[in-house]
Amino acid sequence: MIARGKSSVEFSKVFLRSSAAISGPKEKKGPLGEFFDYSYDDPYCRTENWEQAEIQLQKDAMQLALKKIGLEFTDIRVVVGGDLNNQLAITNYALRDFDVPYLGVYSACSTCTQSIALASMLVDSGYGENILTITSSHNSTSERQFRYPTEYGGQKPNSMTSTATGAGAAIISNIPSAIKITRATIGKIVDPNLSDTQDMGRTMAPAAAMTLKQHLEDFQIELDEYDLMAYSKLRIDF
């Protein structure tokens, strides 16, 4: 592992060994529905409340990622990840029965990629052979607390995007596999001074652009270095 430029790191032997994605019923109907490993037909995920449903989503994703390569939680050095609830309550409850070390990440939309970046650093530093990452959200837990708190009293327009119900897990390892993780760039806080609380896309876009710019500078590469650049945003363009 070598530090590059101001904000980046280059890995020597880090791989995505396994992954799993579990979704709710609405997500199954979307354009990515066929790619989920499993989708519930009930937003309660056969539990009694929204929080228990999200806990179940996390457990399913983690256990399936492990099952795909024949591992158990005892084979995992540490779990890195989080959710959108206060004090990362969902992830803490999901992991409490598995007796595994845990590093919490509370980073909104970047929780998934930040967890993978941190796990990659831990693997390449020699801390562990297999590190599990987990990220989740549930429309009915996050929207009432994280994005539209009940006490805030805000009205959500029909044109707004909807927080996903689902969980994704990945096992980052130094054991070679088909997908190698080679680079990571840590972003900075960029405040565009926008006041429209309904437009999260334009609020996030400047930080994404600056991170991409820094990535290219740190590694002294051009855009054509990559076949595809994917960016997720909280906005729908018409």
Show which residues each predicted segment covers:
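Oxyanion-binding "anion nests"
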Residues: A205-K233, D237
